[in-house]
């Protein structure tokens, strides 16, 4: 079975396009925004600028955050801005604490792994399974002959 069929439905268009202020396509969405000082404001978006603006208006990328406005104006002037607040100080303290913690755990010089200059002693190595251990020398020659014959499929 196929999907839904599409039909070309004629739509009447006005002779002149309507001005944007009269061309509202839906209700404005409202949200409550709190800034750093705890002041609550109601921000609306949607109908006035059209439903598909997504912050493309000039100068309205971050309208409610003063730090963002400061950074945007500094970006226009090609200057760098560093926000000095309690978060930066806490971050620097956490990084220095992490560095001291790692240095204490590693014990000074970094551990690079085992040295491969000399092989380990046989007492440290694991023992092989018993069926891997070769049998006595008395019938090893017969066993090898049998294995060779079976491999070469030669019957004597």
Curated annotation (Swiss-Prot):
Biased composition (Basic residues): 19-31
Cellular component terms (Gene Ontology): nucleus; P-body
Motif (SH3-binding): 117-123
Localization (cell): Nucleus; Cytoplasm, P-body
Predominant location: nucleus
GO BP annotations listed: nuclear-transcribed mRNA catabolic process, nonsense-mediated decay
Keywords: Activator, Cytoplasm, Nonsense-mediated mRNA decay, Nucleus, Transcription, Transcription regulation
Chain residue ranges for the region called Disordered: 1-32
Pfam families associated with the record: PNRC (PF15365)
Role noted for this protein: Involved in nonsense-mediated mRNA decay (NMD) by acting as a bridge between the mRNA decapping complex and the NMD machinery. May act by targeting the NMD machinery to the P-body and recruiting the decapping machinery to aberrant mRNAs. Required for upf1/rent1 localization to the P-body. Also acts as a nuclear receptor coactivator.
Similarity comment: family membership: Belongs to the PNRC family. PNRC2 subfamily.
Protein name per Swiss-Prot or TrEMBL: Proline-rich nuclear receptor coactivator 2
Species whose genome carries this gene: Salmo salar
Source lineage: Eukaryota, Metazoa, Chordata, Craniata, Vertebrata
Gene: pnrc2
